[in-house]
Design a protein with these regions (language model features):
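A short, conserved structural fragment
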Residues: 51-61
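Short acidic, hydrophobic short linear motifs in intrinsically disordered regions
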Residues: 25-35
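Hydrophobic alpha-helical interaction segments
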Residues: 142-223
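Short amphipathic alpha-helical interface segments
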Residues: 11-25
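Short gly/ser-rich loop at a beta-strand->alpha-helix junction or flexible surface loop bordering the NTP-binding
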Residues: 82-173
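Short, cationic-aromatic polyanion-contact patches
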Residues: 5-13, 28, 61-80
Length: 223
């Protein structure tokens, strides 16, 4: 594992790291600033820190991330930017049916959605039966009309809704798959973080399987 900072990352740093993991070619500071939506001085500052951590190298053509080191840093330092506390919900339906219903309800209210662990990793690199799924949204979302009931906490929940102020969490960076059967997915690096956050040895195994798929390029959508 690489040495981590004591301060948690902001949304811009996290997005830059996800972007560096997604690309396989050298990228300039200007490209990264445009891609992520932060200032070039901020990009320079983040790249300097990542270079000192041996997670990024500078070449004559731009910056190249070391994917495995960057993923380790992301798992240790990232925290999603949330508007409020996550909201746990419960449903008796099969997991895929639950999330399809959640997505349909979100669409009816004009709410953007990105599906993360457990369901998204199961769609990309199946390993464990999904029992709880984190969903990121850009607005508060009441799931009562979608057939869910409020749960007391994670232990009772089958879905967790996280209202995020970070819109970069609502779509995967190219070339990663952004949807499966029209269901929008979070970036695989965020899925890895959520597997660790939800916890359990089987989820760590699922995260390792997803990491291997990222490192092997198996999740990239062919152009």
């Amino acid at each position: 594992m690489v040495t981590t900072a004591t301060r948690r990352w902001g949304a811009g740093t996290s997005a830059l790291v996800r972007a560096l993991i997604a690309t396989t070619r050298p990228v300039s500071q200007v490209e990264l600033a445009t891609l992520v939506g932060v200032s070039q001085p901020r990009v320079s500052q983040v790249l300097s820190r990542l270079t000192k951590s041996s997670a990024v190298t500078s070449t004559t053509d731009g910056y190249v991330g070391r994917r495995e080191q960057l993923i380790d840093l992301y798992v240790d330092n990232h925290r999603p930017a949330l508007v409020g506390a996550e909201v746990p919900w419960y449903s008796l339906r099969p997991m895929r049916e639950q999330i399809d219903q959640l997505f349909a309800h979100a669409n009816s209210t004009g709410t953007r959605v990105a599906v993360s662990a457990d369901l998204a990793p199961d769609l990309l690199a199946p390993w464990r039966h999904p029992t709880l799924t984190v969903v990121y949204v850009d607005d508060a979302l009441d799931l009562t009309a979608a057939g869910f009931v409020r749960a007391e906490g994670r232990v009772d929940a089958t879905a967790i809704v996280r209202h995020t102020s970070d819109t970069t969490l609502l779509a995967a960076f190219e070339p990663w798959r952004r949807s499966v059967d029209e269901l929008p997915l979070a970036d695989p690096v965020q899925q890895i973080w959520d597997l660790h956050d939800l916890g359990g040895a089987d989820r760590v195994d699922a995260a390792d399987r997803l990491i291997a798929a990222v490192l092997d390029g198996k999740l990239a959508v062919e152009s």
